[in-house]
Amino acid sequence: MKPFSSLSFGFAVAILIAAQPACSSKSSGGGGSGGKYGTGGIPSSGGSSGNGGTTAAGGTIGSGGAAGNSGGTTGSMDAAAGGATGTGGTIASGGTIASGGTTGGSGGTTGGPDAGMGGVPGKGGSAAGGAGGSGQDAPQGSGGNTSGTGGAGPGSGGAPLTGGSTGSGGNGLGGNTGTGGAAGGTTGNTDGGTSGVVACPDLPGAERSTLYSITANGAPLFVEKLSKFSPEMQVHYAYASLSGTGAATIAVTVSETFSTYKLSPKSRQISATKSGNTITFSSGPNYLILQVDSKELLFILLDAEETNPPHVGDANVKSLADYTVDNTGATLVTSKIQSAINAASGATQNILYVPPGKYTVGELWLKSNMTMYLACGAILYGSSNTGDFNTGSGGINIEGMQHSLIRMYQIKNTNLLGRGVLDSNGVAIRAAGLNASLLKIEQSSSITVDGIVVRDSSYWNTLSYRSDQVTIQNYKVINCRPTTTTYNNTDGVDFVESTNGTLYNAFLYTGDDGMAPKNEDSNGTINCKNLMHQHIVVYNNSVGCKIGTNSMGQSMDSITFKDVDVVKAGRAMTIEAYDTAVVSNTTFEDIRVEAADSMLINLALDVPPTWRTAADTGVYKDTYFTNVSSDVKQVVSLHGKSSTVNITGVHFSNFTVQGKAITSQTDTDASWDINAYV
């Protein structure tokens, strides 16, 4: 093989970096087991009934729950508050002095069913907390509605323990059942530690997995099986948020016997142990994939706790519940939710809060100057009737993809936030002949999408078209993936003719490309520029990190893929631009490949387009591969088309295959396929 002048290897840089692992931890990486932090209480859905709270070592004085009135009222799910119990409650016992710390007050048990008679106050959540001191008595319940609160503050010497869950209110005759608060104590501040776990309410109608069960810090998480993907790959997933800065202990129990397992991404360097049919490990916020033998995959999706989420009752928040919308999924509620969206745009109450529940909808159009917030446990579920997706006009039709579950068309300053779920029911509407994305952002600016799970798109899941300053983060994509190595057009996130876009901290499980910026318009009036894809986990059948295939227009410039774990893909990194655009200043940096079915790297210009009419005249200039490592030896294919339609300036720095440094294109530790036009 002759040397190619346009191919460069950074020898000095490679030697310098080789002493440091290419998959070293980064600021955005998930937490390891680390030291031990004092933890807050594990949130319980609605609070546990009966037993009083346990005194936390190093905790502050927890206040006892106040007695509720006859027929206790429902406790707030938004606050760390237990529901009110029945009258006649006894005084909660005072806390005892914690070892090296302060005392935590123990709570009482809940009221009985008979009009609250003889009820004992619900306890306050225990917590790791401040300086030690003597315990004090909790106030006597006297029919009041005061809720028990968890202690707060840093621990000071005592060994941190998990704070207790809150107590439930009594069920008085003729009254509503009181419900315990959802929050536990706050995380302590001693060295080392574990995170508190905030679990979502179960999604209405979700199918519980019979293969996997999970606990986080001992609390069960709901594991959903997406069997609707059958006969294609069926998957299971669990989701939670972690409070604090430490790690949670995750235990996964498999109902069937198994011998091997793999936890990915491997770059997280999480040590797991197997005991019987249970796998245990510690992790901070991370998006993880567990492969057990050849069984169906399990996704464990752990986010950091939300910062300042909206609450019902805030001056700028309007709840969807105020519109008497069916939250069981039994009826179509598109028009009611659209009315609520329209009312929020530019209003004082410009945050539309979607509470837990299932809402069956067709196409919805978000508006400027508003926020839609999906609470944990809320799901907007697409109708199976394709006609319900034709609710408006405007926007581009790409490959028959005119409609979407959520539309943002010619708007600005709009947010889509929360820990809820969007599911476009793609399997059903694809079978009915409709190509529809799940989220379509068109000709819009200053858009933020944060935290949600987006599932089952019939076509490209998330599309940003001719938009500027779109930020998508903490994003979980779960699409249908074929059982074979074929693909079904269910891309993850595609920036199309967009500028200054960011995809950060995302999980992309797709049946086609994970990320694939494109140019669609042959006129070339707007082109892709300044696009960042960073801290991503990818598992798919096609390409992990890709530019193309559509590459119309004049240019595609400054596109970066950084800190990406390709757990599995057909091809890991690809530029496949067969049209007219000059693709320049492309960066693949800190890319870690665990599996690639056919190619590790594929830069191609010599494959004729089969379904487009644009001239194949594009070129690739200055493509950088920096800190790229692969566990598999697959083909590195670099193919130009001619002396003018060619590839120039391909730069490798710290490129390793199966642990071996690649220092030239003649190095046999990599599998090279380079033609004369590179």
What would you call each of these model-derived segments?
Residues G10-Q20:
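Bacterial N-terminal signal peptides
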Residues A19-S195:
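Ser/Thr-rich, Pro/Gly/Ala-heavy low-complexity intrinsically disordered linkers and tails
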